[in-house]
């Protein structure tokens, strides 16, 4: 199943913790996965959803 990335709607500020971002994406936003990705000008928490 293909996953599409979307910036987290609940994360604010710079993303410095992959696990925290992943847990927040999964628990709060019902995503499949999440990680800190560099999006200019800083690292953001990106959630991955089924397309």
Swiss-Prot record:
Alphabetical list of SMART domains matching this protein: Knot1 (SM00505)
Pfam family, one: Gamma-thionin
Modified residues (Pyrrolidone carboxylic acid): 1
Cysteines engaged in disulfide bonds, as pairs: 4-51, 15-36, 21-45, 25-47
Keywords recorded for this protein, A-Z: Antimicrobial, Disulfide bond, Fungicide, Plant defense, Pyrrolidone carboxylic acid
Gene3D superfamilies assigned to the protein according to its UniProt record, in alphabetical order: Knottin, scorpion toxin-like
Any Gene Ontology biological process: killing of cells of another organism
Subunit structure: Forms oligomers in its native state.
UniProt record similarity statement: Belongs to the DEFL family.
Its biological purpose: Possesses antifungal activity sensitive to inorganic cations.
The protein's name in its UniProt record: Defensin-like protein 1
Source organism (scientific name): Sinapis alba
């Amino acid at each position: 199943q293909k996953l599409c990335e979307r910036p987290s709607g609940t994360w604010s500020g710079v993303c410095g913790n992959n696990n925290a971002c992943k847990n927040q994406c999964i628990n709060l936003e019902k995503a499949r996965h999440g990680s800190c990705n560099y999006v200019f000008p800083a690292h953001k928490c990106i959630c991955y959803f089924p397309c």
